[in-house]
From Swiss-Prot:
Protein name: Serine--tRNA ligase
Protein species of origin: Streptomyces coelicolor (strain ATCC BAA-471 / A3(2) / M145)
Family annotation (CDD domains): SerRS_core (cd00770)
GO cellular component: cytoplasm
GO molecular function: ATP binding; serine-tRNA ligase activity; tRNA binding
Length: 425
């Protein structure tokens, strides 16, 4: 959530942010009104309580008619204090509810617009010219089937659409990717973590995934637990309700977890293969830093993502995501998109978001520096979303006979194997 003091001092900035997101600008005025009621009702409650306490002392010293009048006033005060308390609680609840609906403040350098209004910042690598090489590229599903690596038919039989099995070299390729990604993260100073896949509502809400993203989340009604769509959620909530020593920052975690997404708004999109699925594994980077260090940390996370994709020998570009395409918790977001030959376009493989103090305020995570305690900043970045990375590797490193060249960085994790060969029929 944002700082209420900032809202009071510069409401136009918050309105501009909401407008850039394509969200309800009127929410800002509703929140200002609720906050004013909360503050004024709090003042009234404090005044009545002070009078009530003072009256108790006077009653002890009074007698006769004076005491009777004071007792009458005390009875009225009891009613008034109760009403003021209820009014204060109601105004506070309304303020908190509206505050939870407000997105993070969009960074002023973020391009304004929707999904297609991003700005390309960098392009890396070159697209292969398959025509010059003399063959038509196969898509990742055809290649996966030739290699005995991907089985979507049995995935659908067992679990429904957008589920799959990774078999043989497909399973080995996932394990190689995960181990290589964790090795890179560990070398960069991240602490590896295996995180829970089920979290409580306060963890999901605290990271900003129960607002605009709620329809994409799986919920277990009987247990009131949520399946995470990313280990960002448990990694952010790891220090919930804690005060961290400033000398410990930055804290960097690399979480590995299964991820679950309903893909409710994706009907008809990417129905072939494993690019968009309901369950997948992912290595996620997460950082806790001082607020003034968040932009520099954001660049570091992006550099680590670029280093990873470069090590996989993939052509990719970096985009500055437009304002209306940001998640509610992100002030700024960069995506790295790999070139997918059979689609003839770049597709998202990684993303990194600077969430500033938004999540830490919601999760009550603070930092202590001497006698000063304040919210800190949180950031996240995908290192390896496994299925999409497999898609990019298969398509970009395929050879005419249906085999796939293994990027050098993965070979130590595949027993030195240099090529994935089609299985014998």
């Amino acid at each position: 959530m944002i700082d209420l003091r900032l809202l009071r001092e510069d409401p136009d900035r918050v309105r501009a942010s909401q407008r850039a997101r394509g969200e309800d600008v009127a929410l800002v005025d509703s929140l200002l009104s609720a906050d004013e009621r909360r503050r004024s009702s709090g003042v009234r409650f404090d005044e009545l309580r002070a009078e009530q306490k003072g009256l108790g002392k006077l009653i002890g010293k009074a007698a006769g008619d004076e005491k009777a009048e004071l007792l009458k006033r005390a009875e009225q005060l009891k009613t008034d204090v109760k009403a003021a308390d209820a009014e204060r609680d109601a105004a506070d609840a309304e303020t908190q509810e509206l505050l939870q609906r407000l997105g993070n403040l969009v960074h002023p350098d973020v391009p304004v617009g929707g999904e297609e209004d991003f700005v390309t910042l960098e392009t890396h690598g070159t697209h292969r010219d398959f025509a010059a090489e003399g063959f038509e590229p196969r898509d990742h599903l055809e290649l996966g089937q030739l290699l005995g690596a991907i089985d979507v038919e049995r995935g659908a039989k067992v679990s429904g659409s957008r589920f799959y099995f990774l078999t043989g070299v497909g399973a080995l390729l996932e394990l190689a990717l995960v181990n290589a990604a964790i090795a890179q993260a560990t070398a960069a100073g991240f602490t590896p973590m295996l995180t829970p896949a089920l979290v409580r509502p306060q963890s999901m809400a605290g990271t900003g995934f129960l607002g605009q993203a709620a329809q994409d989340v799986y919920h277990l009604d009987k247990d009131d637990l949520y399946l995470v769509g990313t280990s960002e959620v448990p990694l952010a909530a790891y220090h919930m309700d804690e005060i961290l020593d400033g000398d410990r920052l930055p804290l960097r975690y690399a979480g590995f977890s299964p991820c679950f997404r309903r893909e409710a708004g994706s009907h008809g999109k990417d129905t072939r293969g494993i690019f968009r699925v309901h369950q997948f594994d992912k290595v996620e980077m997460f950082s806790y830093v001082l607020p003034e260090d968040s932009q520099a940390e954001h660049q570091r996370l992006l550099e680590w993502e670029k280093q990873w994709l470069t090590s996989l020998e993939l052509p990719f570009r970096v985009i500055d995501v437009a304002s209306a395409d940001l998640g509610s918790s992100a002030a700024r977001k960069y995506d790295c998109e790999a070139w997918i030959p059979t689609q003839g376009k770049y597709r998202e493989l990684t993303s990194t978001s600077d969430c500033t103090e938004f999540q830490s305020r919601r999760l009550s995570i603070r930092v202590r520096e001497g006698k000063k305690v304040r919210p800190l900043a949180t950031l996240n970045g995908t290192l390896c979303a496994v299925p999409r990375t497999i898609v990019a590797i298969l398509e970009n490193h395929q050879q005419a006979d249906g085999s796939v060249r293994v990027p050098e960085v993965l070979r130590p994790y595949l027993g030195g194997r240099e090529v994935l060969e089609p299985v014998a029929k």
